[in-house]
Amino acid sequence: MKKVTIRDFIKKKSTKEKITMLTAYDYPTAKIISNTGLDSILVGDSLGMVVLGYANTLNVTMRDMISHTRAVARANPPQLIVADMPFLSYEIDTKSAVKNAGLLVKAGSDAIKLEGGEEMKDTVKAIVKAGIPVMGHIGLTPQRFLRLGGFRTIGKTKQEEDQLIKDSLELEDAGVFSLVIENTYVDIAKRITEKLNIPTICIGAGPYCDGQVLVINDLLGLSEFTPYFAKSYVNLKEIISNAINQYIIDVKNNKFPEKQHYKERES
């Protein structure tokens, strides 16, 4: 599989070939993904919740994102690597936003993703001007869950719906190459997808986007809580627990290690 590029992303919209994206946070996972036909890896700030054990993503730092981006990049996957910009790494001013975006690219990402709507237009323009591709993110934006009143579906009111449409158009105009739409109503996501020339990637926003993204822990059945919009394709939590329990039994009953697991001196 050849390296997936920004151009490939945009082409898939015109050919109506669905884009597939999953999160990954470490070398082993990225190495497995590299041997699949997945289009893109998102080094998401969701690592704060599913890897580091935080209650939300607000505690994730640039140091965290750089470290995990490097780990994923070391697997040298052909997938397009997109790294999240963490909370307060891009909101303060455009200068620090460009600098932090550059640090993620130096760590191995092919593009960065940031949350927010029209208020992020100047920031997006500055990062794109610096030569760094930007993926937008609207709808439920986890870094802003306090302002949004919690993790909820966005677009219930006409005002929210109109704002989502406006945000998507403003971000496209600012130069984002793609747009994540999270946890909004399916008809709104469909309208946005039809209005934009750039590909949309849905998570909890229905089937009419140009692609889908999931947190890999949800897909693999590893999460403590799986949101309604995610699908578990395997229950790795159960498989891993069974393996650990079998190991305990084998050790306690002297069934491990067996002869093939150690060496004896020749007599």
UniProtKB/Swiss-Prot annotation:
CDD domains: KPHMT-like
Catalytic reaction equation(s): 3-methyl-2-oxobutanoate + (6R)-5,10-methylene-5,6,7,8-tetrahydrofolate + H2O = 2-dehydropantoate + (6S)-5,6,7,8-tetrahydrofolate
GO molecular-function term, one example from the UniProt record: magnesium ion binding
Localization in the cell: Cytoplasm
Record pathway: Cofactor biosynthesis; coenzyme A biosynthesis
Keyword Acyltransferase: no
Gene Ontology BP term (one): pantothenate biosynthetic process
Cofactor binding summary note: Binds 1 Mg(2+) ion per subunit.
HAMAP family the UniProt entry points to: PanB
Annotated PANTHER family: 3-METHYL-2-OXOBUTANOATE HYDROXYMETHYLTRANSFERASE (PTHR20881:SF0)
Protein name as annotated: 3-methyl-2-oxobutanoate hydroxymethyltransferase
Species in which this protein is naturally found: Saccharolobus islandicus (strain Y.G.57.14 / Yellowstone #1) (Sulfolobus islandicus)
